């Protein structure tokens, strides 16, 4: 017979283990892909598989015109850029966009009922170009739809990120002025040590490289910069593209998400539901004390390359063709880019943070990052095994 004290002790231990398992489960509620994905050179030229990057969404208007990409933070919240959705009322979130062919996959849409533009967003300088969108109903998560992790608070020692990517749709012309919403593609990015662009505060920059322009020039407004957390294989949101990336070679800027972590969490908490419940993964991670995210690489740019950026900032017209949901017919839809005027902000606002370059190949190239299902992690196997042994021994 087991004593009451023994039962009490076993009950407490079982409770502690259940709490640990609860934290473990909640920590996998973001940044997890449901299948192992091969990263590196492959014959498919960077095609995104159906279960890869399930947090990337398309923001569209009531006529199903693509406005910008976005990134899922939770069942209700999507992060994107302010410049593409300002002064708009009717926006829908299209999920599972790895393949936009309606004959192959049905796409679910979620109407947006709340749009939060950063209060200090400047349409001239494009500073604070970030926005939150809340869906009317909770997005249903599955193999094709998941949330990505992001830092909900600033850390003294930043996490070590690796294997960074951006994604987008292929341009259908050599100039990149036209784009067909079809199969999503991806491009690897890496750090640079210098950038010729004028950068506002809380932005970073990167570029395409000449050698790989035969594939595609990706990176449209709102497209997330996605990186893996070293040793954990969790995907973390690094930034959202601001503008650029349409010409090859060419430069692009993106908004650094971690600098807006307080703004994101506070706005979501005020409007509800909050995002704090999704950040247990931060507590379980022992961050590395090594330097920046990745190896720094020098790169210089010619006047002709910088000219591509200038032409972009003067404004472009882009025609987007895609399949309307539930309809096999294709509509040709125009999206006119807004002209970017001269900045009214003081030059003192600029800083020199890190930057990224498309098509790098040092980290993650030619490797298989197994364990997108985090139950393959050694510490989790030990924990689960311990729980099973404990329960079996108490039967």
UniProtKB/Swiss-Prot annotation:
Q: Name one GO molecular function term.
A: serine-type endopeptidase activity
Disordered: region residues: 324-348
What GO terms in the biological process aspect are recorded for it? proteolysis
GO CC term (a single one)? extracellular space
Q: Give the subcellular location.
A: Secreted
User: Could you tell me where the Basic and acidic residues compositional bias lies?
Assistant: 331-345
- Protein name, as recorded: Inactive serine protease 54
What is the scientific name of the source organism? Homo sapiens
